[in-house]
UniProtKB/Swiss-Prot annotation:
Source organism superkingdom: Bacteria
InterPro entries, alphabetized: Cell_div_FtsB, FtsL/DivIC
Function: Essential cell division protein. May link together the upstream cell division proteins, which are predominantly cytoplasmic, with the downstream cell division proteins, which are predominantly periplasmic.
Cytoplasmic side: 1-3
Organism: Shewanella sp. (strain MR-4)
Pfam families assigned: DivIC (PF04977)
Name the UniProt record assigns to this protein: Cell division protein FtsB
Bilayer topology term: Single-pass type II membrane protein
Subunit and partners: Part of a complex composed of FtsB, FtsL and FtsQ.
A biological-process GO annotation: FtsZ-dependent cytokinesis
Alphabetical keyword list: Cell cycle, Cell division, Cell inner membrane, Cell membrane, Coiled coil, Membrane, Transmembrane, Transmembrane helix
Lineage summary: Bacteria, Pseudomonadati, Pseudomonadota, Gammaproteobacteria, Alteromonadales
Any one GO CC term of the record: plasma membrane
Amino acid sequence: MKFFVIALIVLLGLLQYRLWSGDNSLPEYFVLQKQIAAQQDGNAKLNERNQVLKEEIIDLKSGTEAIEERARNELGMVKEGETFYRVVGGDRSVSSPSQ
Protein backbone atom coordinates (compact mmCIF):
# COMPACT_ATOMS: atom_id res chain seq x y z
CA MET A 1 0.00 0.00 0.00
CA LYS A 2 2.86 2.35 0.85
CA PHE A 3 4.42 1.68 -2.55
CA PHE A 4 1.10 2.44 -4.28
CA VAL A 5 0.81 5.82 -2.51
CA ILE A 6 4.40 6.73 -3.39
CA ALA A 7 3.82 5.72 -7.02
CA LEU A 8 0.70 7.90 -7.17
CA ILE A 9 2.57 10.87 -5.68
CA VAL A 10 5.39 10.45 -8.21
CA LEU A 11 2.87 10.17 -11.03
CA LEU A 12 1.07 13.28 -9.80
CA GLY A 13 4.40 15.14 -9.66
CA LEU A 14 5.24 14.14 -13.24
CA LEU A 15 1.84 15.24 -14.47
CA GLN A 16 2.15 18.56 -12.65
CA TYR A 17 5.60 19.11 -14.17
CA ARG A 18 4.22 18.45 -17.62
CA LEU A 19 1.26 20.73 -16.96
CA TRP A 20 3.32 23.71 -15.81
CA SER A 21 6.64 23.47 -17.66
CA GLY A 22 6.59 20.78 -20.32
CA ASP A 23 5.54 20.92 -23.94
CA ASN A 24 1.97 22.16 -24.39
CA SER A 25 1.97 23.56 -20.87
CA LEU A 26 -0.45 26.13 -19.48
CA PRO A 27 1.90 29.13 -19.90
CA GLU A 28 2.45 28.14 -23.53
CA TYR A 29 -1.32 27.81 -23.95
CA PHE A 30 -1.88 31.36 -22.70
CA VAL A 31 0.82 32.73 -25.01
CA LEU A 32 -0.79 30.95 -27.95
CA GLN A 33 -4.21 32.34 -27.00
CA LYS A 34 -2.78 35.89 -27.12
CA GLN A 35 -1.17 35.21 -30.49
CA ILE A 36 -4.44 33.82 -31.85
CA ALA A 37 -6.34 36.91 -30.67
CA ALA A 38 -3.77 39.21 -32.28
CA GLN A 39 -3.92 37.24 -35.53
CA GLN A 40 -7.72 37.36 -35.55
CA ASP A 41 -7.61 41.14 -35.10
CA GLY A 42 -5.17 41.42 -37.99
CA ASN A 43 -7.35 39.17 -40.14
CA ALA A 44 -10.43 41.28 -39.38
CA LYS A 45 -8.61 44.44 -40.48
CA LEU A 46 -7.40 42.76 -43.66
CA ASN A 47 -10.89 41.44 -44.42
CA GLU A 48 -12.28 44.95 -44.02
CA ARG A 49 -9.60 46.30 -46.35
CA ASN A 50 -10.32 43.55 -48.88
CA GLN A 51 -14.02 44.41 -48.79
CA VAL A 52 -13.26 48.07 -49.50
CA LEU A 53 -11.03 47.06 -52.41
CA LYS A 54 -13.68 44.70 -53.80
CA GLU A 55 -16.27 47.48 -53.68
CA GLU A 56 -13.85 49.83 -55.42
CA ILE A 57 -13.19 47.27 -58.15
CA ILE A 58 -16.92 46.72 -58.69
CA ASP A 59 -17.44 50.49 -58.81
CA LEU A 60 -14.64 50.92 -61.35
CA LYS A 61 -16.01 48.12 -63.53
CA SER A 62 -19.60 49.33 -63.46
CA GLY A 63 -19.49 53.03 -64.19
CA THR A 64 -17.48 55.97 -65.36
CA GLU A 65 -18.16 58.14 -62.30
CA ALA A 66 -15.58 56.34 -60.18
CA ILE A 67 -13.01 56.51 -62.96
CA GLU A 68 -13.69 60.22 -63.40
CA GLU A 69 -13.42 60.85 -59.66
CA ARG A 70 -10.15 58.98 -59.49
CA ALA A 71 -8.76 60.86 -62.48
CA ARG A 72 -9.68 64.17 -60.84
CA ASN A 73 -8.28 63.36 -57.40
CA GLU A 74 -5.17 61.37 -58.23
CA LEU A 75 -4.15 62.72 -61.63
CA GLY A 76 -5.46 66.28 -61.35
CA MET A 77 -7.48 66.03 -64.57
CA VAL A 78 -10.12 68.61 -65.47
CA LYS A 79 -13.16 68.30 -67.72
CA GLU A 80 -13.20 70.13 -71.00
CA GLY A 81 -14.58 73.63 -70.51
CA GLU A 82 -13.91 73.60 -66.76
CA THR A 83 -11.65 76.06 -65.04
CA PHE A 84 -9.39 74.70 -62.35
CA TYR A 85 -8.61 76.91 -59.37
CA ARG A 86 -5.97 76.02 -56.85
CA VAL A 87 -5.99 77.93 -53.61
CA VAL A 88 -2.49 78.12 -52.26
CA GLY A 89 -1.75 79.57 -48.91
CA GLY A 90 -0.35 78.75 -45.57
CA ASP A 91 -1.85 79.43 -42.22
CA ARG A 92 -3.33 82.88 -42.17
CA SER A 93 -3.65 84.21 -38.71
CA VAL A 94 -5.98 87.08 -38.04
CA SER A 95 -4.34 89.47 -35.68
CA SER A 96 -6.41 91.83 -33.65
CA PRO A 97 -5.04 95.31 -33.06
CA SER A 98 -3.55 95.68 -29.63
CA GLN A 99 -4.92 98.45 -27.46
